[in-house]
A protein has these predicted regions:
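A structural motif corresponding to the C-terminal lobe/cap of the Radical SAM core domain
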Residues: 1-176
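Membrane-proximal basic amphipathic "stem/tether" segments
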Residues: 156-159, 163-217
Length: 217
């Protein structure tokens, strides 16, 4: 999409294009290389795409895979910092976070997952179990390389991020509600103290968060 001309971008905008989903995947160049998706994606190119879409009023919806081997914690923190860069550049950008789940393809990532004790189900009954349904949604807590403390860090970061930058896809959120969410989360976001945001959890019970990956405009 970076090769599209300004005229093409303008035509897409004028035709009603509001949002584009992008698999940004990671804020780590090394992780992107290890994913080997066959493209030339880099964190810098992701930022350039976000910048360009902002100039045309088109919302980028970016998905990130958190906690990639061989160092899931360092990988997660690097991508968390990158997400902050994205939001600084374009506050309207939608962020979707998934936990790393392997695919059964030969490569470093899958080999390292197997070394941690990971194995895919062998029967249909195992595949349709609740644990593996969660796995298919990339939100499972059973993956051995993502320890519970790291999962909690990611969950807390996501809650603070979603309060400070409420999704633009939720038309139920009035201006007043958005201001309340931003006000109560601002000190945590700016100080990077994400741990145990109990006040935001309580607030989200009153103002339920609508996930952009399951709902649209």
């Amino acid at each position: 999409m970076m090769q599209y001309s300004d005229r093409t971008w303008a035509l897409m905008r004028d035709a009603g294009l509001k949002m584009v989903f992008l698999g940004a995947e990671s804020g780590s160049l090394e992780t992107l290389k290890r994913m080997d998706k066959g493209g030339q994606m880099t964190p810098e190119k992701t930022l350039e795409m976000v910048r360009r879409m902002k100039s045309y009023g088109i919302v980028p919806e970016l998905s990130f895979v958190m906690g990639n081997p061989p160092d899931p914690e360092a990988d997660a923190h690097q991508t968390m910092n990158f997400i902050r860069q994205v939001k600084q550049l374009n506050p309207a950008a939608e962020i979707i976070m998934y936990l790393y789940t392997p695919v059964p393809l030969a490569g470093d990532l899958y080999d390292e997952a197997q070394a941690e004790g990971f194995a895919f189900p062998q029967t249909l009954e195992e595949w349709v179990s609740p644990a593996w349904l969660n796995f298919s949604q990339r939100r499972s807590l059973t993956m051995p390389w993502i320890k519970r403390p790291l999962h909690k860090q990611l969950h807390d970061f996501e809650r603070v991020l979603n309060a400070y930058y409420p999704t633009s896809t939720d038309t139920r959120l009035t201006g007043a509600r958005r201001r309340v969410l931003k006000l109560l989360s601002s000190w945590r976001y700016h100080t990077r103290i994400y741990r145990s945001p109990l006040e935001l959890r309580a607030l989200h019970r009153l103002i339920a968060y609508q996930r952009p990956e399951t709902s649209g405009f």
